[in-house]
Curated annotation (Swiss-Prot):
This is Uroporphyrinogen decarboxylase. GO terms for molecular function: uroporphyrinogen decarboxylase activity. Catalyzes the decarboxylation of four acetate groups of uroporphyrinogen-III to yield coproporphyrinogen-III. Keywords: Cytoplasm, Decarboxylase, Lyase, Porphyrin biosynthesis. PROSITE patterns: UROD_1 (PS00906), UROD_2 (PS00907). The record marks D77 as: Transition state stabilizer. GO terms for biological process: protoporphyrinogen IX biosynthetic process from glutamate. Its main location: cytoplasm. One of its GO terms (cellular component) is cytosol.
Length: 365
């Protein structure tokens, strides 16, 4: 495959010196872009868009044509695995994802297959291969999956939920049953992510969107333990380079030390956690990614610049920071405001890396 021309993201996730802080956005390929909305209308459905490698490739590349980003992230959905398990995924207007066959019993769990990522999920790995070819080494490609706990909430509830009542009832009444489901989903997720890496993904993110809904000890038992298992079993080198893994638990600020001990390379932070305090807590064990409040992008470009400056100052000098939002970019955000954020990172972050760049230059000299 092509030689990587911009490796800032991979270097930052390994806490190596960079000339400026790398930047990308969660959901950077999505509804806030008019070109995405046009292609989505042509495709006719979200599943057609995500399930067609050529279309998924085009959507993945769209934000890179607009913005000087330091990474591409695969356009897909976290629910591809339960869909491949036969749960019958549909997206309903105004309601979101719905499963026709939710998992509610021991028999349901027993009959769940572990999908072959090069069979039932071949459209994803084909998209990864196509994107890598089209990127031609410009920036690294991030692959991803949902955490087992987050996927289980959808599989048990049958869709989105505000209180996770069925899932939490199983957690408290039948914990062993939930563990059996999580074990199977973790197996499937590990195979799926390793297939993405084999196809060309150069970094991996695990999105634990609903881990923050768990009680303190329940998070460790029912979410973090399974993410740690996945991290331990992932392929960690491809194309002669380390493949970094980032864990992101929304609302996960209280568990940062435990998350850093999983063997991952980086932690994604939402906007409720102070970046500088997080850095003090985890030390140099992991890189940190984040964590601008996505709603800042509704504000003026001047305010956006000031808030970018605050996030950069919170982290402080030195390597190990990837600038990102604290969650996905909202559909109503003006694209120019995303551009203002990216420009501000480019302009304001080099000063935080000057000493490291000088030291690296002296070492190489």
């Amino acid at each position: 495959m092509s030689v990587l021309k911009n490796d800032r993201l991979l270097r930052a996730l390994q806490r190596q010196p960079v000339d400026r802080t790398p930047v990308w956005m969660m959901r950077q390929a999505g509804r806030y872009l008019p070109e995405y909305r046009e292609l989505r209308a042509q495709a006719g459905s979200f599943m057609k868009l995500a399930g067609t490698p050529e279309l998924a490739c085009e959507v993945t590349l769209q934000p890179l044509r607009r913005f000087p980003l330091d990474a591409a992230i695969l356009f897909s959905d976290i629910l591809t695995i339960p869909d491949a398990m036969g749960l019958g995924l549909r997206f309903l207007p105004g309601e979101g994802p719905v499963f026709d066959h939710p998992v509610r019993s021991a028999a349901d769990i027993e009959h769940l297959p572990v999908p072959d990522p090069e069979d039932e999920l071949r459209y994803v790995t084909d998209a990864v291969r196509l994107i890598r070819r089209e990127l031609d080494g410009e920036v690294p490609l991030i692959g991803f999956a949902g955490s087992p706990w987050t996927l289980a909430t959808y599989m048990i509830e049958g869709g989105s939920s505000k209180d996770y009542r069925r899932c939490k009832a199983m957690l408290y009444d039948e914990p062993e049953l939930l563990h059996r489901l999580l074990d199977k989903v973790a197996q499937a997720t590990t195979a799926y992510l390793n297939a993405q890496i084999a196809a060309g993904a150069q970094a991996i993110m695990i999105f634990d969107s609903w881990g923050g809904a768990l009680a303190h000890d329940a998070y460790r038992l029912f979410s973090l333990a399974y993410m740690e298992r996945i991290v331990r079993n992932l392929t960690r080198e491809a194309d002669g380079r380390h493949v970094p893994v980032v864990l992101f638990t929304k609302g996960g600020g209280q568990w940062l030390e435990a998350m850093a001990a999983t063997g991952c390379d980086g932690l994604g932070l939402d906007w409720t956690t102070n970046l500088g305090q997080a850095r003090d807590r985890v030390g140099d064990r992991v890189a940190l990614q984040g964590n601008l409040d996505p709603c800042v992008l509704y504000a003026s470009p001047e305010t956006i610049r000031n808030e970018v400056a605050r996030v950069l100052a919170d982290y402080g000098p030195g390597p190990g920071h990837v600038f990102n939002l604290g969650h996905g970019i909202h559909p109503a955000i003006p694209p120019e405001h995303a551009g203002a954020m990216i420009d501000a990172v480019h302009q304001l972050s080099p000063r935080y890396h000057e000493q490291q760049a000088e030291a690296s230059s002296l070492t190489q000299g």
